[in-house]
Structures are given as C-alpha cells and as structure tokens.
Amino acid sequence: MTIPLYEVLILASILFAMGLACVVAWRANVIMMLIGIEIMLNAVMLTFVGGSAHWGIAEGQVFSLMIMALTSAEVSLALAMVAYLHRRKQSVDTDDFSSMKG
C-alpha cells in the first residue's frame, strides 16, 4: 500500500505553513523561531522522502539524511547561543542578540 504523492505534498505544505506561521508569529522569541524552522525543515524532508518513494530513487532519502545532520548542527549551535544569551541578559528575545557582537 503506497501513499499517493499528492497527499504527501499536501501534508508537507500544511507542515511548512505551520512552521512559517510559528516563525512569523513568534519573531521575538528565539526558541519558538527555532521550533518553527525545525517544522519547516521536516516538511522539506517529508517532500524529499515522498518524491523518492514515488519515483523509486534514493537521492531524496540521502538529502533527508543530510538535512537531519544540518539541523542537528544548527540546533546545537543555536541553543548554545540562546543559553549564553539567557545567562547574560535573562531573556531570549531576538532584540538582545545584537549585544552579542564579537
């Protein structure tokens, strides 16, 4: 039993829209922006895997693994910066990141 590609694309579009809404609605909070970005990247991975399964090629799954590696590095760096900012300013607002100029 296979899932049609259009259903995968509809689900990925809904997920991407939810992630985009999270990023736009919570622009002041860095953690909520990270969650939204992760949801959007998961939608992209779902699209790659769905296309890969539909056309019978493995490149979509390889790209999904690369996206997973990229997002894990992105999250670890972003959370380290958020932890540093929270210790220093007692806040996780995006406006406070301008004080971290090196």
From Swiss-Prot:
InterPro entries: NADH_UbQ_OxRdtase_chain4L/K (IPR001133), NUOK/Mnh_C1-like (IPR039428). It is found in: Cell inner membrane. Keywords: Cell inner membrane, Cell membrane, Membrane, NAD, Quinone, Translocase, Transmembrane, Transmembrane helix, Transport, Ubiquinone. It is an enzyme of class 7 (translocase). GO terms for biological process: ATP synthesis coupled electron transport. One of its GO terms (molecular function) is quinone binding. GO terms for cellular component: NADH dehydrogenase complex; plasma membrane. It is a multi-pass membrane protein. The chain crosses the membrane at residues 5-25, 30-50, 62-82. Its EC number is 7.1.1.-. The keyword Glycoprotein does not apply. It catalyses: a quinone + NADH + 5 H(+)(in) = a quinol + NAD(+) + 4 H(+)(out). It holds the Pfam family Oxidored_q2. NDH-1 is composed of 14 different subunits. Subunits NuoA, H, J, K, L, M, N constitute the membrane sector of the complex. NDH-1 shuttles electrons from NADH, via FMN and iron-sulfur (Fe-S) centers, to quinones in the respiratory chain. The immediate electron acceptor for the enzyme in this species is believed to be ubiquinone. Couples the redox reaction to proton translocation (for every two electrons transferred, four hydrogen ions are translocated across the cytoplasmic membrane), and thus conserves the redox energy in a proton gradient. Belongs to the complex I subunit 4L family. This is NADH-quinone oxidoreductase subunit K 1. It comes from Citrifermentans bemidjiense (strain ATCC BAA-1014 / DSM 16622 / JCM 12645 / Bem).
